[in-house]
Amino acid sequence: MKKILLTFFSIGCIACTPIKQSTIDTTLQTKVDSILQNKMSEINAISGQAIIMDMTGNIKAMVGNGKKQPSSLMRPISLHKALETGKVHLSDTVDTEEGIAIINGDTIKDHNWHRGGYGKITLKQGLACNSSIAVAKATQMAGVEAIDSLVTPLEMLKLFNSIIKNDSLKSALRYYITDGLGKQASSDKVEVAGFSGRSTISVDNSEKPEYAVEFIGYFPANEPKYSIIVSMNKKGLPASGGLMAGSVFKDIVDCMAAK
């Protein structure tokens, strides 16, 4: 429990960190705003935010509005926590069963549970296919708690920046782009790495469910200089973090790489 409380405390501290307005690139921010607004209009999003940060923590662009909400982008954070113990490795095999598993009393479903799940896969493959079960079993094997907290996109980006110094995780996040669900975010101008997700924000019987579609990543993949998060909320399906938020990430990266 102490580790969870410390995590919540660190997230709270992140929220209090002021943004240095002098670090904002106004030209870049205008371009990012246009890219985000175009995609939001295309998918009928009700809100959205895009943030660019350099590796020193300076904000280069921040457009739109973000709020505290669940985020499936926490999976790489939880996996990082497990890897840091040295008790599990990306090459370890876990059984995701038929896409439904009971772990620590909780029923966890992978997105493809109705198609029979992924079965036995490595943890690297588990992250690449966004398997909730694989990450949950990794934390269980390592004896740590999975991180599950409400966060803003800015808080999420700062947490993400803190883990991408881990070379093993960096290789897994690159693999997510080349061989996993993040192919839509791939750029032909520079190698990128990252992770996408979709979270259910609210379910109202009288309305379509609200989803958050998100992508978080960085470039260049080998020596990160900038990290980017894109988060958009929309009503109803389709709702894909990789296809929707990932394409915004790609457009932003291409814009920056062209400078």
Question: Where are the regions a protein language model picked out?
Answer:
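Bacterial Sec-dependent signal peptides at the C-terminal "C-region" and cleavage site
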Residues: 12-23
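Sec-dependent N-terminal signal peptides
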Residues: 4-12
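Conserved catalytic neighborhood of penicillin-recognizing serine enzymes
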Residues: 88-144
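Active-site SXXK
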Residues: 32, 57, 68-97, 126, ...
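A penicillin-recognizing enzyme superfamily signal
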Residues: 26, 133-136, 148-256
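Beta-lactamase-like hydrolase cores
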Residues: 22-53
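Short, glycine-anchored, charge-dense loop/turn motifs used at functional sites
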Residues: 50-62
